[in-house]
A protein has these predicted regions:
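Short amphipathic alpha-helix that is part of the acyltransferase structural core
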Residues: 1-14, 18-32, 129
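Conserved GNAT acetyl-CoA-binding A-motif
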Residues: 73, 80-92
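Conserved catalytic-core motifs of GNAT/GCN5-like acyltransferases
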Residues: 89-91, 106-122
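Conserved acetyl-CoA-binding loop-helix of GNAT-fold acetyltransferases
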Residues: 59, 65-78
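A conserved beta-turn-beta hairpin within the catalytic core of GNAT-like acetyltransferases
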Residues: 41-54, 64, 117
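Short hydrophobic/aromatic beta-strand element in the GNAT-like acyltransferase core
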Residues: 10, 21-25, 35, 56, ...
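Conserved active-site tyrosine of GNAT-family acetyltransferases
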Residues: 100, 105
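Conserved beta-strand in the GNAT
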Residues: 25, 31-42, 53-58
């Protein structure tokens, strides 16, 4: 879950409607069970000029650990490259760092706190590696 127990409004982000933003979803029997959103957004501490931020990745608890998030990212990677970007970054929750490493992300720096959300790590994936 993205923000379990929080209003739906907390899952809406600035940039959701931008032209270069795209949203992916996995459906099982017509029900949306996993989502990922990609934003054309440069991180201030990463030099690569063109970047996408992965934000809002979530899977319903009953559908976690079935490869849905990995599948969404495998769809996202070529779309990002098609938009002439070769780097994706995210602020990974501490408990999700292992997942991101499995799909090729690398950690940068130290864990940091996002208020009300806990410890996170800046992670990047270079699509040309």
């Amino acid at each position: 879950m993205l923000f379990n127990g929080q209003p739906v409004k907390t899952c809406q982000f600035e940039g959701d409607d931008e032209d270069q933003t795209f949203h992916l979803g996995a459906f099982i029997e017509g029900k949306l069970v996993s989502v990922a959103s990609m934003y054309f957004e440069k991180h201030p501490n990463i030099e690569e000029p063109y970047q996408y931020q992965l934000q809002g990745m979530a899977t319903l608890p009953d559908h976690q650990y079935k490869g849905l998030s990995s599948a969404l990212l495998q769809v996202a990677f070529p779309i990002v490259k098609q938009n002439l970007c070769h780097l994706i970054w995210c602020n990974a929750r501490e408990e999700a760092i292992g997942f991101y490493k499995k799909v090729g992300f690398e950690g940068i720096g130290e864990l940091f706190e996002i208020p009300n959300l806990g410890q996170h790590l800046l992670m990047v994936k270079y699509l040309d590696k």
